[in-house]
A protein has these predicted regions:
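Membrane-interface interhelical linkers
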Residues: 20, 72, 77-109, 117-130, ...
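Helix-helix packing/entry segments at the starts of transmembrane helices
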Residues: 1-4, 68-78, 117-152
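Transmembrane alpha-helical segments that form core, pore/gating elements
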Residues: 39-95
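Hydrophobic/small/kink-forming positions within alpha-helical transmembrane segments
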Residues: 3-8, 51, 55, 84, ...
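C-terminal-most transmembrane helix of multi-pass membrane proteins
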Residues: 140, 144-183
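Membrane-interface helix termini and inter-helical loops of multi-pass transporters
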Residues: 31-34, 38-39, 89-108, 151-160
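Juxtamembrane helix-loop boundary signature in multi-pass membrane transporters
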Residues: 4-52, 62-66, 166-183
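Hydrophobic/aromatic residues within transmembrane alpha-helices
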Residues: 12-14, 64, 71, 126, ...
Length: 183
């Protein structure tokens, strides 16, 4: 859902150029999402909220002409007080899981920062180099790898509706990326 919002924002707010095939690919993804919503009769509120908020973030980052490193530093400094308040609140409720008594958990927590920061930095660098639409296409990789991992490795069953949606989305991604390659 996120790449669709980002591409839409690129067209509307950044005046990015899209030919007929790219627009067709966008419509295919939208149809795929709409198909799943109609089949399951559930609106994915969480997915829509996350996708919309991250698309707005990408749009703002694309519009503001600041180096990625400096912008991430500013964002981190702005969010730091909220993180400290949340941390103190958890400590007050005795929900402090941030103790260093368990080595494995401490290792995971220490690496959570870089594992979040590095992809975010690379994404914002990509926004500076290309349009918001092409930069957002990488976000089809995560649900695809989760889908393949779930079905091929963990043996999860996939109903026909999800399979149809998956095929439509990847046909759209192929069309879109093929158009980018031609440019």
């Amino acid at each position: 859902i996120f790449p669709i919002f980002s591409i839409f924002f690129g067209i509307v707010f950044l005046k990015e150029k899209f030919n007929r095939n790219k627009i067709f690919a966008i419509i295919l993804v939208f149809v795929s999402i709409l198909y799943l919503i109609l089949q399951y009769k559930v609106l994915p509120w969480i997915g829509l909220t996350v996708a919309l908020s991250f698309s707005i973030y990408g749009l703002i980052r694309k519009k503001i002409n600041i180096d990625s490193s400096i912008a991430l530093l500013i964002e981190t400094l702005l969010l730091c007080p909220f993180a400290i308040i949340a941390f103190l609140f958890l400590m007050k409720l005795n929900l402090n899981i941030f103790s260093f008594s368990e080595v494995k958990l401490s290792f995971y927590l220490l690496w959570a920062g870089p594992m979040t920061l590095i992809p975010l930095y690379l994404y914002t660098k990509g926004l500076q180099l290309v349009g918001i639409g092409p930069a957002s296409m990488i976000f089809f990789a995560t649900p695809t790898s989760q889908f393949l991992l779930g079905t091929l490795v963990y043996g999860e069953t996939v109903d026909a509706h999800r399979l149809i949606s998956f095929i439509i989305v990847w046909a759209a991604v192929f069309i879109y990326l093929n158009e980018i390659r031609k440019e």
